[in-house]
């Protein structure tokens, strides 16, 4: 690590989620060292929120657009000098998990393949299936982060689709099969 890199790590930074994909619900912002200097700035755009994890604990959930000043125990030059025995690496880490506050609509779900059976009265083959769509809006980002995501870097609409399918489609398929057996 050169002198230029050490100097650059001492500067305050501006943190923001610039490239928000249309199907992305949660995103862990990658920073070079997670050693965010005191008085760095966090920018939250409309339709975004941010969970701040500092020293391993959720410290804040921000949902209003704006510019926020970050407070940390990492001070320019002083922290680096005090941690020279740890290769100048601070043990005070700050991570940012951005999330979409806008509603995500028209996420499709359905049975992977239809349930087939022979209709008893006319002896015709019938295929039954279920499908639909749903919308997702994150109401309690901290709860979702702690109970579902943990430190997952990215969480997409497709992940929600898989979760819904595993929890709803399988029981619905079993229900359709039970209806078929009742009618026979």
Which residue ranges define each predicted feature?
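Interfacial loop/beta elements and low-complexity acidic/Ser/Thr-rich segments
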Residues: 1-127, 131, 135-149, 153-160
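A short secondary-structure junction motif
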Residues: 141, 148, 171, 175-178
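Extended, charge-rich, solvent-exposed interface segments
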Residues: 160-170
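Long C-terminal interaction/binding lobes of large macromolecular proteins
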Residues: 168, 173, 183
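Residue-level detector of conserved catalytic or cofactor/ligand-binding positions
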Residues: 178-184
């Amino acid at each position: 690590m050169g002198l230029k890199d050490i100097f650059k790590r001492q500067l305050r930074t501006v943190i923001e989620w610039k490239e928000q994909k249309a199907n992305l619900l949660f995103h862990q912002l990658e920073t070079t060292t997670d050693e965010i200097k005191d008085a760095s700035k966090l920018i939250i755009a409309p339709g975004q929120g941010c969970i701040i994890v500092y020293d391993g604990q959720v410290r804040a959930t921000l949902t209003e657009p704006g510019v926020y000043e970050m407070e940390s125990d990492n001070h320019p030059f002083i922290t680096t000098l005090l941690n020279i025995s740890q290769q100048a690496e601070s043990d005070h880490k700050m991570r940012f998990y951005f999330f979409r506050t806008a509603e995500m609509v028209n996420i499709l779900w359905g049975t992977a393949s239809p349930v087939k059976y022979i209709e008893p009265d006319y002896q015709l083959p019938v295929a039954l299936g279920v499908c639909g769509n749903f919308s997702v809006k994150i109401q309690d980002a901290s709860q979702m982060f702690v109970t579902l995501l943990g430190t997952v870097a990215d969480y997409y609409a497709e992940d929600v689709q898989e979760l819904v399918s595993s929890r709803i489609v399988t029981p619905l398929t079993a229900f359709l099969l039970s209806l078929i057996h009742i009618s026979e």
